């Protein structure tokens, strides 16, 4: 037995940091391989442990999760294939029913619960994990930030905290989530111009932290972003200020009754349209999609390739298109068998036989459809305003409102919607894309294409609850929201004394306001990080940025040199998540998990899903076992 406890610091105690804590306590616990090993686990989290920044239990009660209650969990279950001891705990639904019966009475698995409720559940889960740890495991909470890390004697690490504490530990796990970013040059210039002219600019960031109180009732506000952050901030600015939605509008649509305290929002985004609604059927959980083309064998073929030799658009995208297109046409012909000149089985066979040609802009069955509008055209879905121009914002708004109502109809009857069938397929392939990315086989240029696909997939398959789209349409009808169009160019007009926005989507005068709300969350980019810990790691050489291999294979394929393309990630070994130093050497005792490694892994912000062999728990277990294995304590040393 060692003379002193094994020391581990976990930086960040949101869902991922909490998962690492749970896996550490399980592997150190009575049934684990490191049973009876004294340990001290330091949890560094300035916010509520378990909930972290995103799931703050004190955030506005109006904000909803974008996933359904039946999918949410903080604990592994018996579907999780991991080496460590099997443990379990209540899902969100089970917690609400058995441990907090008054927290969400009547909550159903298919409903989208409140984000604050999820935060309270995660905080409870963290407390339960802490309480149930074996008596020889000491868990110490540090309600502050980590600001620096360096080497200490005996191969240990010294973690410096913002309150002046210095922790000397055997291993550190970085689970920091979304940290603050410095503005990109163009955004910094816009913010500086706004300050010079006394304008209100709310920069991009976490929606619950935005100073929305600075936006005055009736004041015009330009808004950039129509994705998930937008819907959160829209809710706070409307129903959060006393407005009400009544379910007595035409065709059962909601009608908005303003409180008079709302600002007037003029919103636009890159696409110019909001994310599409998630399916939402009363009394039924969302149905999944069974993979046919982008299956395990396809993943195995791609991941067996040499680093940097797989082109995303040439080799991965065709598999995605085949999967989504087949789902589209299968549903189309189930709902409208007469839509094609061929029988359904023959058309689907022809589509499947086309192979990789489905991803290069040609549709192998288009000539057999009576109506060109029935084609599966992913690029048209991605650019819905391409080639369209409207006389003014009023004409565009009427068109967009009708589009939202059509999307709502599809979301409420997804089994009859080719679009929602394709969306389910796109959601299903994301796990396959994650495996390909983690293998390090994509070419450097593919990472730009991968960034595009992430945006496209989010727009199609990871949108808000359908109820939020219904509310947005009602807010448009009530005159609270107006739409500017695609790619609005925002500048500061010194003569006019305000922001000015122009979009090629609409003719007529530009949109003007003295306030600008950036309703989006910047992607993780190590080069722009404002986090002193991450920046210090790179500056000291303990860590390095990740670069992807170039098309010629001359890049690092998961490293930091050789002429590759920077992905914005902290460089780690894909398999065990050990941080690589400036020379590319994996550090034995420093690990990173989740958002900071977006680029080495993909879609890292996704949460754990119950009964789905969640990757988050598998990675947390692998990290915990590597941490314990890297110390001088071994399972056979007891």
For the regions a language model picked out, list residue spans one by one:
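Flavin (primarily FAD) cofactor-binding/catalytic cores of flavoenzymes
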Residues: 1-59, 103-631, 638
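Redox-cofactor-proximal catalytic regions of oxidoreductases
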Residues: 47-104, 587
């Amino acid at each position: 037995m060692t003379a002193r406890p094994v020391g581990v610091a976990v930086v960040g105690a949101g869902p991922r940091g909490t998962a690492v804590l749970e896996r550490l306590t399980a592997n150190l616990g009575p049934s684990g391989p490191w049973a009876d090993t004294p340990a001290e686990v330091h949890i560094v989290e300035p916010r509520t442990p378990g909930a972290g920044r995103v799931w703050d239990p004190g955030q506005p009660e109006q904000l909803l999760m974008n996933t359904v209650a039946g999918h949410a969990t903080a604990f592994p279950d018996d579907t999780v294939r991991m080496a460590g001891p099997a443990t379990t705990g209540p899902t969100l639904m089970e917690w609400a029913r058995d441990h907090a019966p008054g927290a969400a009475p009547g909550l159903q698995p298919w409903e989208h619960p409140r984000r604050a409720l999820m935060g309270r559940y995660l905080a409870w889960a963290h407390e339960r994990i802490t309480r149930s740890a074996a008596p020889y495991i000491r868990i110490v909470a540090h309600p502050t930030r980590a600001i620096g890390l360096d080497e200490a004697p005996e191969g240990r690490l010294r973690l410096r905290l913002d309150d002046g504490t210095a922790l000397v530990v055997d291993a550190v796990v970085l689970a920091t989530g979304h940290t603050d970013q410095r503005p990109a040059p163009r955004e910094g210039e816009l913010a500086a111009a706004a300050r010079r002219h006394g304008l209100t600019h709310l920069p991009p960031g976490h929606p619950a932290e935005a100073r929305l109180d600075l936006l005055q009732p009736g004041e015009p506000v330009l808004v950039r972003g129509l994705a998930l952050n937008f819907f959160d901030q829209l809710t706070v600015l409307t129903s959060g200020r006393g407005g009400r939605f009544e379910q007595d509008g035409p065709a059962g649509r909601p009608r908005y009754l303003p409180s008079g305290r709302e600002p007037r929002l003029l919103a636009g985004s890159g696409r110019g349209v909001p994310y599409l609604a998630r399916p939402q059927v009363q009394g039924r959980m969302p149905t999944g999609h069974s993979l046919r083309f982008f299956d395990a064998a396809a993943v195995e073929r791609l991941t067996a390739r040499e680093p940097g030799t797989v082109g995303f658009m040439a080799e991965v995208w065709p598999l995605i298109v085949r999967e989504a297109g087949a789902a589209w046409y299968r549903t189309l012909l189930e709902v409208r068998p007469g839509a094609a000149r061929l029988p359904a089985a023959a058309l689907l066979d022809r589509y499947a036989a086309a192979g990789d040609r489905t991803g290069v802009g040609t549709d192998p069955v288009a000539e057999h459809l009576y109506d060109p509008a029935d084609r599966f055209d992913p690029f048209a879905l991605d650019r819905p305003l391409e080639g369209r121009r409207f006389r003014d914002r009023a004409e565009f708004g009427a068109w967009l409102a009708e589009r939202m109502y059509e999307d709502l109809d599809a979301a409420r009857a997804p089994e009859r919607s080719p679009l929602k069938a394709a969306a389910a397929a796109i959601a299903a392939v994301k796990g396959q894309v994650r495996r390909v990315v983690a293998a390090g086989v994509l070419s450097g240029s593919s990472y730009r294409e991968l960034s595009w696909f992430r945006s496209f997939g989010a727009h199609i398959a990871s949108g808000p609850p359908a109820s939020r789209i219904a509310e947005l349409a009602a807010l448009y009808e009530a005159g609270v929201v107006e739409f500017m169009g695609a790619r609005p160019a925002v500048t500061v007009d010194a003569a006019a004394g305000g922001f000015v926005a122009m979009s090629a989507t609409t003719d007529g005068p530009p949109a003007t306001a003295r306030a600008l709300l950036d309703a989006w969350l910047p992607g993780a980019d190590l080069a722009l990080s404002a986090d002193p810990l991450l920046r210090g790691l790179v500056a000291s050489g303990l860590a390095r940025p990740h670069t992807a291999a170039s098309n010629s294979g001359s890049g690092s394929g998961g490293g930091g040199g050789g002429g590759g393309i920077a992905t914005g990630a902290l460089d780690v070994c894909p398999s065990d998540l050990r941080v690589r130093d400036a020379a590319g050497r994996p550090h034995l005792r420093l690990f990173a998990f989740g958002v900071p490694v977006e680029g080495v892994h993909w879609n890292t912000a996704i949460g754990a899903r119950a009964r789905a062999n969640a990757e988050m728990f598998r990675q947390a277990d692998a990290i915990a076992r590597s941490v314990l294995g890297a110390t001088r304590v071994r399972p056979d040393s007891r």
